A protein has these predicted regions:
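Nucleotide phosphate-binding/pyrophosphate-handling subdomain across enzymes
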Residues: 47-50, 60-62, 66-70, 74-75, ...
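Short, high-confidence coil segments that cap the C-terminus of an alpha-helix
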Residues: 24, 45-46, 222, 305-307
Length: 332
């Protein structure tokens, strides 16, 4: 996205050809990182925010110089690559720090914070903790209490960058930005339209994300009419199952198999695991997401539908499949 607008479809192949011509042997994420940087350079942007894809030691985003490094709350994910413990994961992520470059962190579990502090000392980076800063009092465009934690981190980094570059930094402008923030697939509400039931989309695909999603659902007083969930086979599903069962409650739970992804977990196998302990509640596998969406529509009540939407959560690849089916929902 550049200034909140998705990169036009016709620019992707043009930029991709230039990257492939210059560096034909890049990995997938190296390729996407290079393509993004090329797009940003052509647009002449003043500020780029890049999200690491996997850890911080060997992630493609570490190839570029940076002015600041940010750590949102670190949780369990990608254990097969980064390691089986939170310390392993935090140690890898901490390698994103650079000598002399300030690093900002949201509140962390004790072992994760220890890793960040140790690496900061080893690399000569100043680690700035944001836990003691006040929460932004303005309304947020992104739902859930965890987004206030993220917003506090974003404001801390922005204040520092604005001071360094002598950019205008008016509180009312920051408040407007927080209120208008939009992130597809992060507690994203989609009203009933074009045959779709009312939906809330969330890319929660690990225990850390599902805990935040569960809290956001509860705080919004949402009682789902149905839930659609799926994930990749290389995820540690055992720690995610209790969250999905609690989020769904007695509502029907539909489990599609993510299409065109060799890492996708089979919907029937995942449904069997999720059905354990759900009693008579419906837990039904479907061959694909489009079928699950059709099935869930009949469970949405005619009245108070906003309080009883269908929750679509899990793998970002599942959400990607949804956005391919309904591209108009990507925009705010």
């Amino acid at each position: 996205r550049i200034n909140g607008t998705m990169l036009p479809a016709d620019r992707w192949p043009v930029l991709a050809d230039r990257v492939m011509e210059a560096a034909p042997n890049l990995t997938y994420f190296e390729f996407l990182t290079a393509l993004g940087l090329l797009a940003f350079a052509e647009a002449g942007v003043d500020l780029v925010v890049m999200e690491a894809g996997l850890g911080g030691h060997y992630d493609a985003t570490t190839a570029m110089p940076v002015q600041a490094v940010c750590f949102t709350p670190i949780g369990m994910d990608h254990e097969k690559i980064l390691g089986p413990t939170l310390t392993d994961i935090a140690s890898d992520k901490s390698q994103a720090m650079r000598p002399g470059v300030p690093a900002f962190t949201a509140p962390q579990e004790a072992e994760a914070l220890d890793c960040l502090l140790r690496t900061a000392q080893e690399k000569g980076a100043e680690l700035r903790e944001t836990a003691s800063l006040p929460f932004p009092q303005s309304a947020l465009g992104l739902a859930g209490p965890h987004q206030r934690v993220n917003a506090r981190l974003a404001i801390a980094v922005w204040d520092w960058l604005a001071d360094q570059h002598h950019w205008p930094n008016m509180p009312e402008t920051a408040a407007k930005g927080l209120a208008s923030a939009h992130f597809p697939g992060r507690f994203q509400r989609i009203p009933a339209c074009n045959g779709l039931p009312p939906l809330i989309l969330d890319g929660a695909h690990n225990p850390h994300g599902l805990r935040a999603f569960e809290t956001a659902v509860r705080d919004a007083d949402i009682q789902p009419a149905a839930v659609i969930f799926s994930c990749l086979a290389d995820k540690d599903i055992s720690d995610m199952l209790p969250f999905i069962r609690r989020i769904a409650g007695d509502a029907p739970l539909f489990v599609p198999t993510i299409q065109d992804n060799e890492r996708a977990m089979n919907g029937e196998e995942l449904a069997k695991l999720l059905a354990e302990g759900r009693g008579p509640a419906i837990t039904q596998p479907t061959q694909r997401l489009s079928l699950a969406l059709k099935e869930t529509a009949s469970f949405v009540p005619a009245e108070d539908a906003d309080r009883h939407p269908v929750l679509l959560c899990g793998s970002l690849y599942l959400l990607g499949e949804f956005f391919n089916l309904h591209p108009q929902t990507l925009e705010q």
